[in-house]
Amino acid sequence: MKKLLFSAFITPLALTSTLALSAWEKDESVELDVKAQEALTEFKAVDPEVESFISQSVGYVVIPTVGKAGFGIGGARGKGVLYENGAVTAVVTLTQLSIGFQWGGQAYSEFLFFQDTPSLSNFKRGNYELGAQVSAVAITAGVSADAAFVNGMAIFTHAKGGLMYEASVGGQKFKLEGK
């Protein structure tokens, strides 16, 4: 009898929890999509040439806000979305750990454009890491006209605020959660 009552109580509770969690995850991707679109609009306002990167890409990632801080050891974290064919296909989490001379904090947006299917597929496998040898282009008016895809990728950052001094080494890692 106890087992039957336990099952009758736990089963609906588990189903409700699962449905609530999936609704929460959907809301998260919708909210991130709105913020990503706002960041992309800002990027286009600073440099309209970004449209050429979007049109040449098989997919792109927009991380609207990356928070970065450091004092000897530093880190960064941000969440955004992966777009393929104009639609959100995954939530992307960026994490970074760095060691070296660094002090301060800053916030920025990050944009990754994938020129071809192999580079996008490599990113989507989830074991993708941007090391110290990969550089991002800081967005200023007209900068994307001089930027180019390197190894199938183009990466841009747009400062939102803060001040950080650094001479550090560390890589960015990305984790994807599909819809």
Regions found by a protein language model. Give the residues of each.
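Positively charged n-region of N-terminal signal peptides that target proteins for export
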Residues: 1-4
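Bacterial N-terminal signal peptides
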Residues: 7-17
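Small-residue-enriched, tightly packed secondary-structure blocks
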Residues: 23-179
